[in-house]
Amino acid sequence: MGKLLLILGSAIALPSFAAAGGDLDISDTVGVSFWLVTAGMLAATVFFFVERDQVSAKWKTSLTVSGLITGIAFWHYLYMRGVWIDTGDTPTVFRYIDWLLTVPLQVVEFYLILAACTSVAASLFKKLLAGSLVMLGAGFAGEAGLAPVLPAFIIGMAGWLYMIYELYMGEGKAAVSTASPAVNSAYNAMMMIIVVGWAIYPAGYAAGYLMGGEGVYASNLNLIYNLADFVNKILFGLIIWNVAVKESSNA
């Protein structure tokens, strides 16, 4: 029943949003990327909630969180794509509201995947959450004009690097060392997303605000951000799903 309501709710919501924003120009690469990411987030959300019933109890919460991440992103992309198609402006507020919800949930995923198979201190979650909030707060301040662009960029990078340190060298490394091979593999893959996939975001910030002239930054910024969200949110969830299926089959 829950899955049916999810699908029906999405089907009801889509027509009204699809009608908004006018027609999509074939030459509007950024607009096309908004539509592709919107569709991808919806498909991933349905997939994660359907697959939740196929894994053992200790992995259900992880798949639920994966579905929440893509579901929240789907909802915000419905609005963001409309802002872009109607105005050509960057939907900064919508995007950061989305990130303020989904990035901490990705932090939760790291904690959950470790807690499912080994002992992990709650302090790891608190440290990762603090790093993510510094990263997001500084990024928003720079993009919204509340702080100088370059200092905000540096502070945001510091928050991101702190998270990487904790996962690679700190409590994350200590916790995963006692986990199963499947969890180790998933953890390393998730780390690659944090290191390589999340690097797309500062690249977009730099392309939008630190390089290029007035009037060109919006296209650079949104195309890169859309690509990053597509890869980081959906692939992140698929890694969780993969390890959940493997661990459940071995149980």
UniProtKB/Swiss-Prot annotation:
Put simply, this protein is called Blue-light absorbing proteorhodopsin
Lineage summary = Bacteria, Pseudomonadati, Pseudomonadota, Gammaproteobacteria
- Indicate the secretion signal residues: 1-18
Q: What is this protein for, i.e. what is its function? A: Light-driven proton pump. May have a regulatory rather than energy harvesting function, based on light-induced opening of proton channels, to modulate cell physiology depending on light intensity variations. Could be, therefore, a sensory rhodopsin, potentially associated with a transducer component.
The site feature described as Responsible for spectral tuning is recorded at 106
* TM helices/strands, residue ranges: 30-50, 65-85, 97-117, 120-140, 144-164, 190-210, 223-243
Record-level GO BP terms: phototransduction; proton transmembrane transport
> Misc remark for this entry?
Presents a much slower photocycle than that of the green-absorbing proteorhodopsin, probably an adaptation to the intensity of solar illumination at a depth of 75m, where this bacterium was collected. Transport occurs only at pHs above 7 and is unidirectional.
